[in-house]
């Protein structure tokens, strides 16, 4: 086997000269001292085998101490004529697993002669038989600034991190550096684990306010607010369609508080629906007020007087506060054209706090002349309120004269539109004008 590998050995029966033997001992010690600085700590206590194989036994060398390498001993000059047939065994690079985890070496490759010992000086560059670390060797030399490709630190490029990932776990590799004596530090600098800023931002640097800040920001978006308002209106419309009685409870509330000067549902419901439609939320209640004029007012002045008197009567009696906003409705008849009479409703809103007072009128409903004449004939000439109107209302005359007609809502029979709808239309216009007069609310 030795001959096949190209190593020529001295025959066992031929002992080496004494001078060569003496020179081989220090050169072998120097070779072992240099080699021990690149070997594993496991080889510190191993026994060495003499480099020459012959029949005469040689004394074993003392164990090599890796803590402090011995001083360099000058080697004897090599013979001028090299020995023919002497060859240096090729160095074989062990795998990383063998270089780090293999068993301790039991022997070194035998040197063929003293010349072989002389040729085994430490190499000028990094060893190729295995990766080792020294205190004076720069591992970045020869890489032109690139990261060194070593078995200890393989180069790789991590894929881009996407999404929010948990904080990385730093693993500390417990590897024993080769040939490190006491107090010797390795020249390798391992890269530190750096946290991804996106991870820390997603976990620690949460926006101020948390989930409530997010909800507040979304709710303040005009587009989101518009969608929510439309959705709310659709739900309320569905509920009020299925159960009309739920409308006052759904839209009741807010800062707007209004009192209607009547306890009749036809007036209170119409005003409530109109103001809640314009303001969104409004509290609207009804209180019966006295007009202190004739039951059937005649003319615009009488109608306006009756509406205002209802508000004043509630304030005088203490039913409502002096600063309370009130809405009053009063119907009257008027001859707009010769022998052409119409029924009209007068609506008044009064807000003493803001100094607002507005009037509006419903659409005019034609009333046949004969029914107006009957109401005039039923009113005594000495009636004390004759200056303001008639004692008998037009509704009472129509209820007695026509079938299926009521005094409170005869408008539906004549026009197909109920009195409540007429009051609602005028009240909505009144609420719109009132909203424009109000000062803007602070945000």
UniProtKB/Swiss-Prot annotation:
Chain positions covered by the region annotation Disordered:
1-108, 139-206
State any single GO MF term: protein kinase A regulatory subunit binding
Q: Which Pfam families match?
A: NTPase_I-T
Question: What is the protein's name according to its record?
Answer: Protein PRRC1
Q: Specify residue ranges for compositional bias: Polar residues.
A: 34-46, 169-188
* Compositional bias segments (type: Low complexity): 81-96
From which organism does this entry originate? Rattus norvegicus (Rat)
Quaternary structure, from the entry: Interacts with PRKAR1A; resulting in PKA activation.
Q: What is the lineage of its organism?
A: Eukaryota, Metazoa, Chordata, Craniata, Vertebrata
Listed under GO biological process in this entry are: epithelial structure maintenance
Chief location of this protein within or outside the cell: Golgi
Q: Where in the cell is it found?
A: Golgi apparatus; Cytoplasm
Give a short account of what the protein does: May act as a regulator of the protein kinase A (PKA) during embryonic development.
Alphabetical UniProt keywords: Cytoplasm, Golgi apparatus
For whether the record's keyword set contains Ribosomal protein, the answer is no
User: Could you tell me the gene encoding this protein?
Assistant: Prrc1
Q: Where is the composition biased (Pro residues)?
A: 59-80
Q: Name one GO cellular component term.
A: Golgi apparatus
- What protein family is recorded? Belongs to the PRRC1 family.
